[in-house]
UniProtKB/Swiss-Prot annotation:
It holds the Pfam family Trypsin. One of its GO terms (molecular function) is peptidase activity. This is Mast cell protease 4. Optimum pH is 9 at high salt concentrations. Monomer. Interacts with iripin-2, a serine protease inhibitor from Ixodes ricinus saliva. Also inhibited by lima bean trypsin inhibitor, soy bean trypsin inhibitor and human plasma alpha1-antichymotrypsin. Disulfide bonds join C50-C66, C143-C208, C174-C187. PROSITE patterns: TRYPSIN_DOM, TRYPSIN_HIS, TRYPSIN_SER. Belongs to the peptidase S1 family. Granzyme subfamily. Its EC number is 3.4.21.-. The lineage of its organism: Eukaryota, Metazoa, Chordata, Craniata, Vertebrata. GO terms for biological process: proteolysis; regulation of angiotensin levels in blood.
Amino acid sequence: MQALLFLMALLLPSGAGAEEIIGGVESRPHSRPYMAHLEITTERGFTATCGGFLITRQFVMTAAHCSGREITVTLGAHDVSKTESTQQKIKVEKQIVHPKYNFYSNLHDIMLLKLQKKAKETPSVNVIPLPRPSDFIKPGKMCRAAGWGRTGVTEPTSDTLREVKLRIMDKEACKNYWHYDYNLQVCVGSPRKKRSAYKGDSGGPLLCAGVAHGIVSYGRGDAKPPAVFTRISSYVPWINRVIKGE
């Protein structure tokens, strides 16, 4: 139930709380050219935001719980409160949610967005590599999460892209999440540190040695780590089939 409440909190009206980076730093402008900012019109007509990342010129990866009636993707952004010359705004043609996604267990929290047109590759807009199915990220490794989410439980969302270093944890650290599945998810963030992804960062990447290994999925409502990320390597065959149009 705790995880469910946190997921529900992610899709609040824009500016009132979609997820953010806690304990991190502002990213060097345009140093993460694969980052995508999603503006979502929900089924009830509200506006929400999520993160995402470009995996081909026409596909963005994000979390399944970031789906909505309509989504516009902004690529090449650093400060989303401004209209930057580097930005490319592209509407989503099709939202492909994983067929086994379960809102209540949060399993299979992955979605691909097919853009109406291909993104133009520039120094500020580019794709990020995905892992191979055999690339099973192990506990102890230091990775990074990035996003425009809240910088604190009571803080607003960030206009500028931020990032934070996070440690991959053993599955025991996430044992209090009832439906946590080590084969499908990654337990991220040391309970000893005040560093985490939070509201507004949902759908953003977990970056390990230049490869996207995870997707921000859910965590505690009070933002205390660890949080749960979708394990991308487990979904590579499905991702490839979707991109190929199968």
